Amino acid sequence: MNPSEQNHLSVEKPSQTSSGPYTSPPPIGYPTRDAMVGDPPAAAVETKSKGDGFWKGCCAAICCCCVLDACF
């Protein structure tokens, strides 16, 4: 077959009028950037201190890993 006799397919580019890929809406109750009219103001969130027990547990875990590493 002669290369000049081959059928050439033309490919059209998609139109640029689309606004991009479809994205699904966020789940119900998921916070969004836009505040809805009538939404109550966000309450202040109070954080709790993890206390001394948290750090003791972390140190114990690190020591346990070091001992296991030395033994095995």
From Swiss-Prot:
Topology in the lipid bilayer: Single-pass membrane protein
Predominant subcellular localization, coarse grouping: membrane
UniProt keywords, alphabetically: Cell membrane, Membrane, Nucleus, Transmembrane, Transmembrane helix
Signals that turn on the gene: Induced by heat in shoots. Repressed in roots in response to drought, oxidation stress and salt.
Tissue-specificity statement: Mostly expressed in roots and flowers and, to a lower extent, in stems, siliques and leaves.
Annotated TM spans: 49-65
InterPro entries referenced in this protein's UniProt entry, alphabetically: CYSTM_dom, WIH1-like
Highest taxon, organism lineage: Eukaryota
Localization of this protein: Cell membrane; Nucleus
Stretch list, region Disordered: 1-46
Biased composition annotated in UniProt, kind: Polar residues: 1-22
Record GO cellular component, one term: plasma membrane
Role, per record: Involved in resistance to abiotic stress.
Membership in a protein family: Belongs to the CYSTM1 family.
Subunit structure, interactors included: Heterodimers. Interacts with WIH1/CYSTM13.
Name of this chain's protein: Protein CYSTEINE-RICH TRANSMEMBRANE MODULE 9
Organism: Arabidopsis thaliana (Mouse-ear cress)
Higher taxonomy: Eukaryota, Viridiplantae, Streptophyta, Embryophyta, Tracheophyta
Gene behind the chain: CYSTM9
